[in-house]
Amino acid sequence: MAAQIPESDQIKQFKEFLGTYNKLTETCFLDCVKDFTTREVKPEEVTCSEHCLQKYLKMTQRISMRFQEYHIQQNEALAAKAGLLGQPR
């Protein structure tokens, strides 16, 4: 059975998600939307927005992978150090 995440942590995670979403929306909007003379979204604005989002998602994925790799290396180093310390001389 999965452990429940405390409500305070759920709220914190949701606030972080909203902050990230708002930052991404603002960044892509400012980069992609330049013309306010029409109500319609232009095809180039759609394409730009899609590329902006894809780039952000790929970047986030790469950062997460590097973060995991770093933690694995740190854990291996700690395990090796603990193994050396635990051996009699």
From Swiss-Prot:
UniProt cross-references to Pfam families, sorted A to Z: zf-Tim10_DDP
Gene3D superfamilies found in the cross-reference section: Mitochondrial import inner membrane translocase subunit tim13 like domains
Disulfide linkage: C28-C52, C32-C48
SUPFAM superfamilies for this protein: Tim10-like
Similarity remark: Belongs to the small Tim family.
Modified residues (N-acetylalanine): A2
Highest classification ranks of the organism: Eukaryota, Metazoa, Chordata, Craniata, Vertebrata
Alphabetically ordered keywords of this record: Acetylation, Chaperone, Disulfide bond, Membrane, Metal-binding, Mitochondrion, Mitochondrion inner membrane, Protein transport, Translocation, Transport, Zinc
Residues spanned by motif Twin CX3C motif: 28-52
Membrane topology term: Peripheral membrane protein
Assembly: Heterohexamer; composed of 3 copies of TIMM9 and 3 copies of TIMM10/TIM10A, named soluble 70 kDa complex. The complex forms a 6-bladed alpha-propeller structure and associates with the TIMM22 component of the TIM22 complex. Interacts with multi-pass transmembrane proteins in transit. Also forms a complex composed of TIMM9, TIMM10/TIM10A and FXC1/TIM10B.
Recorded domain comment: The twin CX3C motif contains 4 conserved Cys residues that form 2 disulfide bonds in the mitochondrial intermembrane space. However, during the transit of TIMM9 from cytoplasm into mitochondrion, the Cys residues probably coordinate zinc, thereby preventing folding and allowing its transfer across mitochondrial outer membrane.
Cell location: Mitochondrion inner membrane
Job description of the protein: Mitochondrial intermembrane chaperone that participates in the import and insertion of multi-pass transmembrane proteins into the mitochondrial inner membrane. May also be required for the transfer of beta-barrel precursors from the TOM complex to the sorting and assembly machinery (SAM complex) of the outer membrane. Acts as a chaperone-like protein that protects the hydrophobic precursors from aggregation and guide them through the mitochondrial intermembrane space.
GO cellular component: mitochondrial inner membrane; mitochondrial intermembrane space; mitochondrial intermembrane space protein transporter complex; TIM22 mitochondrial import inner membrane insertion complex
Example of a GO biological process term: protein insertion into mitochondrial inner membrane
Residues annotated as transmembrane: none
Protein name: Mitochondrial import inner membrane translocase subunit Tim9
Domain of life: Eukaryota
PANTHER family per UniProt: MITOCHONDRIAL IMPORT INNER MEMBRANE TRANSLOCASE SUBUNIT TIM9B
Source species of the chain: Rattus norvegicus
GO MF assignments: membrane insertase activity; metal ion binding; protein homodimerization activity; protein-folding chaperone binding
